[in-house]
Amino acid sequence: MANLSGYNFAYLDEQTKRMIRRAILKAVAIPGYQVPFGGREMPMPYGWGTGGIQLTASVIGESDVLKVIDQGADDTTNAVSIRNFFKRVTGVNTTERTDDATVIQTRHRIPETPLTEDQIIIFQVPIPEPLRFIEPRETETRTMHALEEYGVMQVKLYEDIARFGHIATTYAYPVKVNGRYVMDPSPIPKFDNPKMDMMPALQLFGAGREKRIYAVPPFTRVESLDFDDHPFTVQQWDEPCAICGSTHSYLDEVVLDDAGNRMFVCSDTDYCRQQSEAKNQ
C-alpha cells in the first residue's frame, strides 16, 4: 500500500492509468510512432520529467523495484526528488543498482549495465518531435512522418559534414526504428544510441509538456542515421575514468580547480561503483 495517505497508489487515478496504458500499447504496436495522450498535472513543473513520471506511475506495481537516474547519476536533484516521490505514493522498494531494478526512469542516459527482458526503461523527453527544428509546424511534421519523408533530416546531417567535416550532433541523435519511423531518442548522448538496438528491455518515452508517448519494443532494430561514406560513430576519450579505470563507458569531464585541471569520471555512478569494487577484489 502507498505510504502517503489520501492518494491513490502511484498518485494517478486508475482511469488515467488505463488511458496511459492504452497509449503505451498503441506505441508498442507501432514502434517509434508518437501517440497523443491526455497528460495530467503533476506535483512538479513541466521540464522536470512529468511525462516519464506519468509512464512510471501507470506501469509500476507493488512488487516492482524502482531506480531513477539523472544524467547517469542516482544522487542528483531530479533523480532524488522523483525517487522520493514514488517511495511516498507507492511504498515500493528503490535501488541504485541497475541489476536489481525492474523499472528504471532515466533522464538523458542509458545505463552501462546491459538491461534484460524483465526490465522497463522509461525516458524523460523534453521534445519528442525529431523534425521540430527543421519544420516547426506540427501539422507538417505529422504529414512527413505519415509519408516517410525524411530527406530533410539527411540534409541536416549532410550540412554538418559540409561545415565541419563530420556529423556534429552529439546528443538526441536521430534514429530510425524498425525500418520505418525516425525518432528522437531523447537527449541521450549518441554514445548510448547503439544500446537501443535489439535491447531486451521495453523502452518507453514520455513527453509531459507535449503530451506524447512513444516506444521501442524489446528486440527491435534501431539504426542511427548516417551515410555510407560517413558512418555513425560514438565519442571516444583519450584517458580512462579517474575513479574506476573504465575505458569503455561514457565519461563526464569534471573541472577540479581554477587552474583548469580536470579529470574524467563515469557518468553512470552505479557502473563506476561496480567497476571499482571488481578492481579492488
Curated annotation (Swiss-Prot):
InterPro entries: PhnJ (IPR010306)
Gene Ontology annotations of biological process type: organic phosphonate catabolic process; organic phosphonate metabolic process; organic phosphonate transport
Names of required cofactors: [4Fe-4S] cluster
Cofactor binding, per record: Binds 1 [4Fe-4S] cluster per subunit.
Catalytic activity: alpha-D-ribose 1-methylphosphonate 5-phosphate + AH2 + S-adenosyl-L-methionine = alpha-D-ribose 1,2-cyclic phosphate 5-phosphate + methane + 5'-deoxyadenosine + L-methionine + A + H(+)
GO molecular function, one term: lyase activity
Pfam families associated with the record: PhnJ
EC number: 4.7.1.1
Keywords in alphabetical order: 4Fe-4S, Iron, Iron-sulfur, Lyase, Metal-binding, S-adenosyl-L-methionine
Keyword Transmembrane helix: no
Annotated Gene Ontology cellular component terms: alpha-D-ribose 1-methylphosphonate 5-triphosphate synthase complex; carbon phosphorus lyase complex
Keyword Oxidoreductase listed: no
Family per record: Belongs to the PhnJ family.
Subunit structure: Forms a complex with PhnG, PhnH, PhnI and PhnK with the suggested composition PhnG(4)H(2)I(2)J(2)K.
Record's function text: Catalyzes the breakage of the C-P bond in alpha-D-ribose 1-methylphosphonate 5-phosphate (PRPn) forming alpha-D-ribose 1,2-cyclic phosphate 5-phosphate (PRcP).
Miscellaneous comment as given in the Swiss-Prot or TrEMBL entry: The sequence shown is that of strain K12.
Protein name as it appears in the record: Alpha-D-ribose 1-methylphosphonate 5-phosphate C-P lyase
